[in-house]
From Swiss-Prot:
It is a multi-pass membrane protein. Its main location: membrane. It catalyses: UDP-4-deoxy-4-formamido-beta-L-arabinose + di-trans,octa-cis-undecaprenyl phosphate = 4-deoxy-4-formamido-alpha-L-arabinopyranosyl di-trans,octa-cis-undecaprenyl phosphate + UDP. This is Undecaprenyl-phosphate 4-deoxy-4-formamido-L-arabinose transferase. Pathway: Glycolipid biosynthesis; 4-amino-4-deoxy-alpha-L-arabinose undecaprenyl phosphate biosynthesis; 4-amino-4-deoxy-alpha-L-arabinose undecaprenyl phosphate from UDP-4-deoxy-4-formamido-beta-L-arabinose and undecaprenyl phosphate: step 1/2; Bacterial outer membrane biogenesis; lipopolysaccharide biosynthesis. Residues 257-269 are periplasmic. It holds the Pfam family Glycos_transf_2. InterPro entries: ArnC_tfrase, Glyco_trans_2-like, Glycosyltransferase_2, Nucleotide-diphossugar_trans. One of its GO terms (cellular component) is plasma membrane. It comes from Salmonella paratyphi A (strain AKU_12601). GO terms for biological process: 4-amino-4-deoxy-alpha-L-arabinopyranosyl undecaprenyl phosphate biosynthetic process; lipid A biosynthetic process; lipopolysaccharide biosynthetic process; response to antibiotic. It is found in: Cell inner membrane. It is an enzyme of class 2 (transferase).
Length: 327
């Protein structure tokens, strides 16, 4: 369909946070899926500061004979997308697939993503069919997807599903970006010329609980809005302008009515007081919006802290090294 480089090696990047119960099954099923590809492959497990024995299980898997697993240990919890970016910085494949560790997205779908990417697509997204999440999670996901589509203009069906495939040039370009708040599916679609989606199965979570609580979903929505666009700041200025104009118009109207009908009509100046108050409130919104615009631009320029700190990388055959910092 498109002229694209052939896929010779596949890298599967999986962020892990307190998933000790699902890890053995995850590794077994992901390994089986990769072995069926007929291509070179590797699995990168990124421990995002787990407090259980996830890191120990990962290291053990990397040190087994004939292992294809690279374990990356972060010093603390940085969040799902930062952990994935840490994995991206260590991949060696031509096609990189991201996968959650909770097994709700079956690893058996990996060959389908590889086959679709082989058609020449830069990014292959997925849409979860028959979602097994709670009504709250489904509703929140719909709101977030709608928000992203309206903000970016990219009509993708399911931005929340992390089972996705990216060609290497897209990964390399994302690694050159230095935003601290990164939402990978959106960032990838900004750089992808050829993107598509395929339907995938969605299973119930067998082990543990979801890591996205109500407050984390709220924080995610806020991060999406603030990292994608400055439109809310402009809307704040627009709202302030409307209120200020309305307040000024009301003030003029009240002055005219007071002169025409007499002071008794104006309730001893109460209406005039509200008109003046609305005018000043509107002016304050305008000032806050402009100030926020400048602060937002300054913040975007100066936030240069690392996204994450890689404490240790364990390669197969028991080789390892320690990094002081990364990205």
């Amino acid at each position: 369909m498109f002229d694209a480089a052939p896929i010779k090696k596949v890298s599967v990047v999986i962020p892990v946070y307190n998933e000790q119960e699902s890890l053995p099954e995850l590794i077994r099923r992901t390994t089986a899926a990769c072995e069926s590809l007929g291509k070179a492959w590797e699995i990168l497990l990124i421990d995002d500061g787990s407090s259980d024995s996830s890191a120990e299980l990962m290291v053990k898997a990397s040190q087994e004979a004939d292992s294809h697993i690279i374990s990356i240990l972060l010093n603390r919890n940085y969040g799902q997308h930062a952990a994935i970016m840490a994995g991206f910085s260590h991949v060696s494949g031509d096609l990189i697939i991201t996968l959650d560790a909770d097994l709700q997205n079956p690893p058996e779908e990996i060959p389908r993503l590889v086959a679709k990417a082989d058609e020449g697509f830069d990014v292959v997204g997925t849409v979860r069919q028959n979602r097994q999440d709670s009504l709250f999670r489904k509703s929140a996901s719909k709101i977030i997807n709608l928000l992203i589509q309206r903000t970016t203009g990219k009509a993708m069906g399911d931005y929340g599903c992390m089972l996705r495939a990216y060609r290497r040039p897209i990964i390399d370009t994302m690694l050159r970006c230095h935003e601290r708040s990164t939402f990978i599916p959106i960032l990838a679609n900004i750089f992808a010329r050829r993107a598509t989606e395929i339907p995938v199965h969605h299973a119930e979570r067998e082990f543990g609980d979801s890591k996205y609580s109500f407050m984390r979903l709220i924080n995610l929505m806020y991060d999406l809005v603030t990292c994608l666009t400055t439109t809310p700041l402009r809307l704040l200025s627009l709202l302030g302008s409307v209120i200020a104009i309305g307040g000024f118009s009301l003030s003029v109207l009240l002055i005219v009515l007071r002169l025409a009908l007499g002071p008794q009509w104006a309730a001893e100046g109460v209406f005039m007081l509200f008109a003046v108050l609305f005018t000043f409130i509107g002016a304050q919104f305008i000032g806050m919006g402009l100030l926020g615009e400048y602060i937002g631009r300054i913040y975007n320029d100066v936030r240069a802290r690392p996204r994450y700190f890689v404490q240790q990388v364990i390669y197969p055959e028991s080789t390892s090294f320690t990094e002081e910092s990364h990205q």
